[in-house]
Swiss-Prot record:
Catalyzes the addition of meso-diaminopimelic acid to the nucleotide precursor UDP-N-acetylmuramoyl-L-alanyl-D-glutamate (UMAG) in the biosynthesis of bacterial cell-wall peptidoglycan. This is UDP-N-acetylmuramoyl-L-alanyl-D-glutamate--2,6-diaminopimelate ligase. Belongs to the MurCDEF family. MurE subfamily. One of its GO terms (biological process) is regulation of cell shape. UDP-N-acetyl-alpha-D-muramoyl-L-alanyl-D-glutamate binds at residues 48, 50, 178-179, 205, 213. It comes from Corynebacterium efficiens (strain DSM 44549 / YS-314 / AJ 12310 / JCM 11189 / NBRC 100395). A motif (Meso-diaminopimelate recognition motif) lies at residues 432-435. One of its GO terms (molecular function) is ATP binding. It catalyses: UDP-N-acetyl-alpha-D-muramoyl-L-alanyl-D-glutamate + meso-2,6-diaminopimelate + ATP = UDP-N-acetyl-alpha-D-muramoyl-L-alanyl-gamma-D-glutamyl-meso-2,6-diaminopimelate + ADP + phosphate + H(+). It comes from the Bacteria.
Length: 526
């Protein structure tokens, strides 16, 4: 175990809410108070809107929005019980116009201080937790699940925050974002601490790093999975995307974790390790690294076993129910992060053995004679990795249903179609979450790439366009025969399809099961 192993905090079980005075909060964030004759006013909660303001003594954080300034909603938050307002000078002008005379705390940029302010209101809870953050383009959710289960097997009480939701010691807690806004996040840390949680595993998105959602959080370990094209609607270039992730690792960054582990299987990982300076490295492709995976064996079911060479421990055996070389990388990274957090690697590895992640290489089995999988892959590199993995598990043909999300990075649409057609025998282009865009426009971009990939592929490829996602799934399953493999890619664990501002219930897993049963019943009747 490393000499600089983080401490394991003593669980706190008090139910008394934390509090900070308005004057203390102003001094902490460097703000200026107005209309505040009583600087000893106690603040117990902080929120960005009325729905997140708790009943006891909250302060409303009014930030500029894409359409309106948050201060325009001051009447709503006042009705919710907000005793004071944290805002900028534009917000103060709006409050004056509305005749709002509550105490106000003025700063130049609310988002810049919101993380520290929220942490202060809830008593800096992350410092009483061993906090492990996972970032990267793909693999965050799977790595986080592996960490959660491994830590639980090692005897710790664990919190999880990520794409598929939040859990406190295994119990679900509703959240909306991969990385919640700073007030919600700090309150979650506070709740976890109250419930005796010792370790928290958290997915950290590039948006969260860029927008300051994790400011004020003390991370013991940061883990980097990989980087590939995504979010170029938010980050203008891959370099900007990389720089956002690097905030978590770069020496001198206020967001940098105490310890870092970086997978160097791709060039971006190698660069990230260089940026971090003192990061420990992970490799599964034969590169020299601190943690290396080897002796990989794969069963017909996709179950994998391998060893990880761990500094000061030697080789640790690992078994995974999850298929794919990328999951060997995810598991090795999870193990490395756990070791950096002072966890016994052997006990941790036992916990990873039976991890299943909703919508990630999730097999759907209704007794059919071909392999059917649902996966969240919605980025070019992820789609390619999933198809490459499935190709190794089947003797027959490979088919995929693929689409792309609206109001998101449009430059990845054609590459997703192209990479699919280079690997699959059948590509069905369909709708994902069109959001406010015209679905046919999105499909056209994916189709362009698919046709190009089919023309350049070293095998015959059929490309179809079926806009209705349920119909596309049925067509894929009707096409599949004995020994084939199919994957419905893009939505994974999601249970809704967002079209023109309306979310319709839609679960790829349900649709695949229904189509499989329907196809089998038709076959039995023949």
């Amino acid at each position: 175990m490393c000499a600089d192993t983080p401490h394991h905090p003593t669980p706190v079980h008090t139910e008394e809410a934390m509090a900070i005075t308005l004057g203390e909060l102003a001094r902490t964030i460097g703000g200026e108070l107005f209309n505040a004759p009583d600087q000893d006013l106690e603040i117990h909660n902080i929120g960005l809107d009325s729905s997140t303001l708790a009943k006891k003594a909250p302060i409303f954080a009014a930030v500029p929005g894409s359409r309106k300034h948050g201060a325009e909603f001051a009447d709503t938050d006042r009705a919710a019980g907000a005793l004071a307002v944290l805002t900028d000078r534009d917000g103060a002008t709006i409050l004056d116009r509305k005749g709002d005379t509550r105490p106000r705390l003025i700063v130049d940029d609310v988002r810049e201080v919101l993380g520290v302010a929220s942490s202060s209101v809830y008593g800096d809870p992350s410092r009483d937790l061993v906090l492990i953050g996972v970032t990267g383009t793909s693999g965050k959710t799977t790595t986080s699940y592996l960490l959660e289960r491994g830590l639980m097997e090692a005897g710790y009480k664990v919190g999880l925050i990520g794409t598929t939701g939040t859990r406190i010691d295994g119990e679900p807690v509703p959240t909306k974002l991969t990385t919640p806004e700073a007030p919600t996040l700090q309150k979650l840390f506070y709740r976890m601490r109250q419930h005796g949680v010792t370790h928290v595993v958290m997915e950290v998105s590039s948006h969260a790093l860029s927008l300051g959602r994790v400011s004020g959080s003390h991370f013991n370990v940061a883990a980097f999975t990989n980087l590939s094209q995504d979010h170029l609607d938010f980050h203008d270039t891959m370099e900007e995307y990389f720089d956002a992730k690097a905030l978590f690792f770069r020496a001198g960054s206020p967001l940098a974790a105490d310890h870092q582990v970086v997978c160097i299987d791709d060039e971006w990982g190698t660069r990230m390790a260089e940026v971090a300076g003192n990061a420990q490295t992970v490799a599964t492709t034969g590169k020299r690294a601190d943690f290396t995976a080897g002796l990989v064996t794969v069963k017909e079911t996709g179950e994998q076993s391998f060893t990880v060479t761990v500094p000061d421990h030697g080789e640790v055996p690992v078994t995974l129910a999850l298929p794919g070389a990328f999951n060997v990388a995810n598991a090795t990274l999870a193990l490395a992060a756990a070791v950096r957090a002072g966890v016994d690697p052997v006990a941790f590895a036992r916990g990873m053995a039976q991890v299943a992640v909703p919508g990630r290489m999730e097999r759907i089995d209704e007794g059919q004679d071909f392999l059917a999988v649902v996966d969240y892959a919605h980025k070019p590199a992820a789609v390619a990795a999933v198809l490459d993995t499935l190709r190794t598990q089947i003797d027959g043909r490979l088919g995929v249903v693929i689409g792309a999300g609206g109001d998101r990075d449009a430059t990845k649409r054609a590459p997703m179609g192209e990479l699919s057609a280079r690997r699959a025998d059948l590509v069905i282009v369909t709708d994902d979450n069109p959001r406010s865009e015209v679905p046919a426009t999105i499909r056209a971009a994916v189709m362009e790439g698919a046709r190009r990939g089919a023309a350049e592929a070293d095998h015959e490829v059929e490309v179809r366009e079926i806009g209705d996602r349920a119909e596309a799934i049925r067509a894929l399953i009707e096409w599949a025969g004995p020994g084939d493999g199919i994957v419905v890619a893009g939505k994974g664990h999601e249970v809704g399809q967002l079209i023109a501002g309306v979310t319709h219930h839609f679960d790829d897993r349900e649709q695949v099961r229904e189509a499989l049963r329907h196809t089998q019943s038709d076959g039995e009747g023949k």
